[in-house]
Regions:
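Active-site beta-strand termini and strand-to-loop segments that position acidic
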Residues: 33-37
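Cytochrome P450 catalytic-core helices
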Residues: 28
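Basic nucleic-acid-binding interfaces
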Residues: 1-25, 38-66
Length: 66
């Protein structure tokens, strides 16, 4: 069976913060970030389990980091 690779919430958050994203809101288990120079906002789910790598890569793409 294929085991899905995962990324921890804190790892992904660290990458975003280093790029200049900052926390603007928390709605339940979803953390929202904005950037001073980039459009839009990024939402990261913080659930009990780690994020699927596919989800983490999608978030990084939205942030302009992939």
């Amino acid at each position: 069976m294929h085991e899905e690779r995962k990324m921890k919430f804190k790892e992904l958050e660290k990458i975003l913060l280093k790029d200049g994203w900052f926390l603007i809101d928390i709605k339940g288990s979803h953390y929202q970030y904005k950037h001073k120079n980039k459009k839009g906002k990024i939402t990261i789910p913080m659930h009990r389990d780690d994020l699927a790598l596919k989800t983490a890569n999608s978030i990084l793409k939205q942030a302009g980091l992939k």
